[in-house]
Design a protein with these regions (language model features):
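Vicinal oxygen chelate
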Residues: 2-23, 43-97, 103-130, 141-146
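Short acidic-aromatic low-complexity motifs
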Residues: 26-30
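Conserved active-site tyrosine of GNAT-family acetyltransferases
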Residues: 32-37, 108, 134
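Short glycine-/small-residue motifs
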Residues: 136-139
Length: 146
């Protein structure tokens, strides 16, 4: 999920990819920050105010990084209205690999469950919940028993 710490050399481009970080858009960022910080132990590493609210926040846990930007901030940041509207087309779907699905389920208690705990054909035990902005977060552990 999120930030990948490995470096990948692309064929024929001469470009090295060093990290991928999702930017998730929300009406209000504060509940999303609390979702990740309070439940899953992420740290807020950066924030940019937008009036009396947050316009942007960066969250990190180990090598995993997430960014949230408010719709209002995106509207100001991207001057093209058509592009700014793309932020509202969501939700985004995240796939988060964890080492203890049962501890993760406990931490996620109270979040709306989109897909109950299941074992997949590809060997993952997973559950999907919604974050406060409506983005779907699938937590998965490979090799676990449901």
């Amino acid at each position: 999920m999120g930030s990948a710490s490995m470096t990948v050399q692309e064929k024929g481009t001469g470009m090295t990819v060093t990290k991928v970080t999702p930017v998730l858009f929300a009406q209000e960022i504060e509940p999303c920050v609390s979702f990740w910080v309070d439940r899953f132990g992420f740290e807020k590493t950066a924030e940019v105010p937008e009036g009396d609210r947050l316009g942007f926040a960066m969250l990190q846990k180990g090598a995993v990084e997430l960014m949230y930007q408010s719709y209002a901030s995106a509207d100001k940041d991207v001057k093209d209205a058509e592009i700014a509207q793309l932020a509202r087309k969501g939700p985004t779907f995240l796939f988060v690999e964890v080492d203890d699905i049962h501890a993760t389920i406990e931490a996620a208690k109270g979040a709306p469950v989109i897909m109950p705990l299941r074992t997949t054909f590809y060997g993952a035990t997973e559950i999907s919940v919604k974050d406060p902005a409506g983005h779907v977060v699938t937590f998965a552990q490979f090799g676990a028993q449901a």
